[in-house]
């Protein structure tokens, strides 16, 4: 599973950097685990060059038995309890007139716990779209209401793959609401007032000399999941950190031996972000081109009609960070047709930063984002 987690992590950092390149002032938030799992499920039905390109884009070239690995990984990261909930759910929605191969359907159920629900896109496109959106809304506790926008499916749609991931966690050390107050958040362009939370407690913290930047780990109750924040030093632009960042460096910078537990004053803004992406262009730039072209797409491992290209890869994510903890939801739909010399160290996130929600045991990045504009 280590090779798979490394592949997923590399894909996560690659996509984070690409999504951020378009506009350095734009907030970014997505679930790489959600994306990797749904695209790898599609990969089961891909053959030839289509499969090779998908494997390369997903960094899966040396990951062994990928689907068995995902079976274990998805089981490992799913956790629940009164104070921490993480759920992943997969489903295939297929045109009822299509002849999907039994082996493909069985593999989706076996490795991704994904059922195939047959719908009639040809006869009632809009009703099918609403049905899929309702399923995602249910699986994300209403946080994601419309993964498929108007016009994203058509009478020609043959297969929609949907993966929903939902997380709600409480901080192990909760912030006290009475200490939250308005404070300036500094971007390159201006200052904006944010509701800044405050907590003084023992946290794991480190400093990256190379960039330079601070690293802070905020664990959730149960300690299986934690939020990692990568905050550039006061006079360092976040773009410098993003340019230097690779998955290998992320793993090094956030490794237990690089972080020291100490009493620290933490200032963290309340966050509430919602982001939507059409990822076709980004996946194409990662070399995954044949899957989107009817003349080249080879999904003969999925259906007798192999030349049925993907027509849309939609991803929508929601995150809320407050004094109690974090609520995050992500859904993907694929439509086919420390260093501190002070006595009391301070971690003050009053300027743009990167953040990650990580499963500690497997080192898997479940969500990642950039907060640069309140």
From Swiss-Prot:
Keywords: Cytoplasm, Protease inhibitor, Serine protease inhibitor. The record marks 339-340 as: Reactive bond. It is found in: Cytoplasm. It comes from the Eukaryota. GO terms for cellular component: cytoplasm; extracellular space. GO terms for molecular function: serine-type endopeptidase inhibitor activity. CDD domains: serpinB8_CAP-2. Its main location: cytoplasm. The keyword Cytoplasm applies. Belongs to the serpin family. Ov-serpin subfamily. Has an important role in epithelial desmosome-mediated cell-cell adhesion. This is Serpin B8. The lineage of its organism: Eukaryota, Metazoa, Chordata, Craniata, Vertebrata.
């Amino acid at each position: 599973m280590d090779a798979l987690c490394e592949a997923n992590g590399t894909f996560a950092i690659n996509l984070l950097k690409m999504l951020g390149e378009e506009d350095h002032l734009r907030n970014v938030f997505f679930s790489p685990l959600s994306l990797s799992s749904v695209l790898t499920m599609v990969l089961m039905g891909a053959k030839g060059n289509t499969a090779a390109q998908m494997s390369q884009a997903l960094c899966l070239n040396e990951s062994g038995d990928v689907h068995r690995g995902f079976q274990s990984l998805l089981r490992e990261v799913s956790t629940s309890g009164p104070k921490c909930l993480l759920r992943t759910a997969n489903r295939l929605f297929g045109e009822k007139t299509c002849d999907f191969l039994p082996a493909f359907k069985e593999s989706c159920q076996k490795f991704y716990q994904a059922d195939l629900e047959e719908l009639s896109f040809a006869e009632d496109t809009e009703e099918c779209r609403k049905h899929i959106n309702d399923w995602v809304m249910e699986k994300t506790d209403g946080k994601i209401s419309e993964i498929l926008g108007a016009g994203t499916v058509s009478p020609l749609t043959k297969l929609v793959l949907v993966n929903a991931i939902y997380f709600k966690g409480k901080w192990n050390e909760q912030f006290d609401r009475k200490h939250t107050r308005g404070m300036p958040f500094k971007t390159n362009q201006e200052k904006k007032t944010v509701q800044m939370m405050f907590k003084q407690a023992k946290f794991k913290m480190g400093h990256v000399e190379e960039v330079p930047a601070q690293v802070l780990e905020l664990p959730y109750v149960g300690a299986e999941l934690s939020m990692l924040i990568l905050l550039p030093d006061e006079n360092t632009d976040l773009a410098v950190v993003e340019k230097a960042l690779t998955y290998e460096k992320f793993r090094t910078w956030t490794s237990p031996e690089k972080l020291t537990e100490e009493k620290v004053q933490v200032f963290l803004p309340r966050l509430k972000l919602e982001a939507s992406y059409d990822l076709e262009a980004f996946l194409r730039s990662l070399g995954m081109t044949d899957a989107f072209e009817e003349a080249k797409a080879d999904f003969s491992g999925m259906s007798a009609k192999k030349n049925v290209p993907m027509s849309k890869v939609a991803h929508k994510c929601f995150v809320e960070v407050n004094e109690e903890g974090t609520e995050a939801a992500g859904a993907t739909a694929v439509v086919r047709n420390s260093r501190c010399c002070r006595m009391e160290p301070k971690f003050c996130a009053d300027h743009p930063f990167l953040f990650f929600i990580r499963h500690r045991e497997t080192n898997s990045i479940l969500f990642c984002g950039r907060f640069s504009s309140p």
